[in-house]
């Protein structure tokens, strides 16, 4: 999820006003208003490419469009210690149906820089459902082939590897994939000049298709209705998610305003806010209706197919690269900025479908920090690559983080408890582990199980081969901190769990003792990586990860181990105090020759606590 569109606080209030029925594999925001079963919310975008983010830092332009009011999340509680706000996990195992629609614009009206014609549809079936994907046999991509280029980097394989074989993506149709043509072209859906806007202008803009995204999805569903039996995918009368692949590239490559930015959203909200972007007035007010009346009308006219509701969707591009040559620093198009076209890769696809399964973004969508950086599919990890070259961006994304694996029911972590004594545990590389031997979990005593640390062994093998982007030494034990009280706010109030300051001089200040009561006091991530070198590069927006983040042979982590420690993030005692001693120790770390890691995990409360 990336760019939140700029709305007024009133718009944000509307965005959080609806409640949502949790159907299928979808988990979305909800709140106290019960007048509608639908969620009027803002889109969730994939992270910008590392190249675009780095260029923004170097040249000083803002890559985000996040509204500060996004942080308004009324949890209704203050607490001086960890709360009891657990995340509601949502298992995603077994056969998971994925309804895929390939969308092409009206012939002769394609996006700037697009290919001549479409990539044959079978390649997207391979990329999403297959076990092999070889776009390099096509003439347009042949130059990027080579002996070290993997051909097994599919969404199916990514989910299989991260879930330890528990999740299988499938489709109900036995027909071949085919492109569905829209009734209008790119010049309409992505128009920048106001040609198709009311009164010849967009009040708030059609950047990345803001004003017409809802129409794009609505028109696509109507065009595909004769080819798809939507009822086959429905659960409790609603299709959980539509997976849209659109012709052209994505704005996440360049910030090009005339391209869609890959995201997860719902049709109702896209239509509602589309009219807002065009006219400055949301759709219900524009049409002189109450919100309930407008929702009922839209459900009947745009969201009902084969007797079921179709609302939630995610959208991603058919090709990669800055094919139009948009220069984000100047706001102009130039030949020197052109990259690609590159074949579509699994990273963005798998990331966006993670949202469909209920996962939040674990990067900072305001681009003030990096969140968990390259260490999760739900953050910058969706852009990892092998070989380490631009044309392979996203072809070898990092595994889903261990919290996400727990959330989706993919793993049963080894739980070490205070009474267990010293546990000497050998962890295989996370890509070679089983579902019950790859992750160690240690809860902070007194936290009601909502605050805990997780440890995993990450090596450059399997999909994690893409970590070569951080150099050959980027491997070892990765330590995570989880605060479910904060992640819970994603489910209950739409709060972005990693859009906060998290580094040392912020994390233990006085306002750490309360959370989300007025929307401004959350001062640590819901999910964070404890970087072994203690530099807090992720929090300080220095990089998305480096070799210094991994714990290696001879390292240790304790409640008082310098700048990086397992001290609780709660129980603040005042300025100058150390954080509460959780007792959590990981010592005697050894990276073995076979890639496994052996370490001692134990509790020793108050041992060696700094005064």
Locate the predicted segments by residue.
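N-terminal zymogen propeptides
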Residues: 28-86
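Loop/turn elements at helix/coil->beta-strand transitions in domains of secreted/extracellular proteins
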Residues: 95-99, 236-242, 373, 448-452
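Active-site-proximal segments of metallohydrolase catalytic domains
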Residues: 68-92, 146-316
């Amino acid at each position: 999820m990336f760019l939140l569109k700029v709305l007024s606080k009133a718009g944000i209030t509307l965005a959080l006003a609806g409640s949502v029925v949790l159907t299928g594999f979808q988990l979305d925001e909800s709140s106290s208003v019960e007048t509608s079963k639908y969620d009027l919310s803002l889109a969730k975008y994939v992270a910008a490419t590392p190249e675009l983010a780095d260029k923004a830092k170097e040249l000083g332009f803002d890559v985000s469009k996040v509204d500060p009011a996004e942080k308004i999340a009324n949890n209704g509680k203050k607490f001086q210690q960890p709360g009891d706000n657990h995340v509601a996990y949502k298992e995603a195992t077994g056969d998971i149906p994925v309804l895929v629609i390939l969308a092409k614009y009206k012939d002769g009206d394609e996006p700037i820089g697009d290919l001549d014609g479409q990539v044959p549809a079978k390649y997207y079936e391979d990329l999403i459902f297959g076990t092999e994907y070889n776009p390099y046999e096509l003439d347009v991509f042949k130059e990027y082939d080579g002996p070290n280029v993997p051909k097994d980097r599919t969404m199916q394989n990514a989910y299989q590897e991260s879930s330890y074989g528990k999740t299988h993506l499938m489709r109900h149709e036995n027909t071949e994939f085919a492109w569905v043509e829209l009734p209008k072209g790119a010049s309409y859906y992505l128009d920048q000049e106001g040609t198709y806007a009311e009164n010849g202008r967009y009040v708030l803009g059609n950047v990345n298709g803001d004003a017409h995204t809802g129409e794009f999805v609505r028109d696509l569903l109507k065009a595909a209705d004769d080819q798809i039996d939507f009822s086959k995918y429905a659960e409790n009368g609603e299709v959980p998610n539509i997976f849209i692949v659109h012709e052209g590239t994505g704005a996440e490559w360049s910030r090009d305003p005339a391209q869609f930015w890959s995201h997860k959203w719902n049709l109702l909200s896209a239509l509602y806010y589309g009219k807002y972007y065009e006219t400055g007035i949301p759709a219900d007010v524009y049409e002189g209706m109450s919100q309930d009346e407008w929702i009922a009308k839209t459900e009947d006219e745009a969201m009902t197919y084969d007797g079921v509701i179709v609302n939630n969707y995610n959208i991603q591009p058919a090709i990669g690269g800055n094919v139009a040559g948009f220069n984000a620093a100047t706001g102009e198009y130039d030949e020197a900025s052109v990259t690609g076209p590159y074949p579509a890769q699994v990273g963005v696809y798998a990331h966006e479908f993670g949202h469909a399964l209920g996962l939040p973004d674990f990067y900072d969508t305001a681009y003030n920090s990096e969140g968990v950086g390259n260490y999760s599919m739900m953050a910058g990890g969706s852009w990892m690559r092998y070989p380490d070259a631009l044309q392979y961006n996203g072809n070898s994304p990092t595994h889903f983080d261990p919290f996400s694996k727990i959330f989706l029911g993919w793993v049963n972590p080894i739980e070490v408890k205070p009474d267990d004594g010293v546990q000497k545990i050998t962890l295989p590389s996370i890509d070679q582990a089983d579902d019950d031997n790859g992750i160690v979990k240690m809860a902070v005593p007194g936290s009601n199980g909502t605050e805990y640390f997780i440890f995993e062994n990450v090596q450059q093998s399997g999909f994690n081969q893409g970590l070569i982007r951080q150099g050959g030494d980027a491997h070892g034990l990765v330590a995570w901190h989880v605060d479910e009280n904060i992640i819970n706010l994603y489910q209950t109030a739409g709060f972005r769990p990693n859009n906060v300051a998290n580094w040392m001089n912020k994390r233990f200040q006085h306002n750490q003792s309360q959370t989300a009561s007025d929307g401004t006091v959350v001062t640590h991530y819901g999910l964070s990586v404890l970087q072994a070198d203690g530099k807090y590069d992720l929090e300080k927006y220095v990089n998305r990860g480096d070799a210094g983040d991994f714990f290696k042979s001879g390292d240790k982590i304790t409640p008082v181990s310098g700048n990086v420690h397992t001290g609780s993030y709660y129980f603040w005692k005042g300025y100058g105090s150390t954080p509460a001693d959780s007792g959590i120790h990981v010592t005697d770390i050894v990276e073995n020759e076979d890639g496994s890691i052996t370490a001692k995990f134990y509790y020793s409360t108050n041992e060696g606590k700094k005064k």
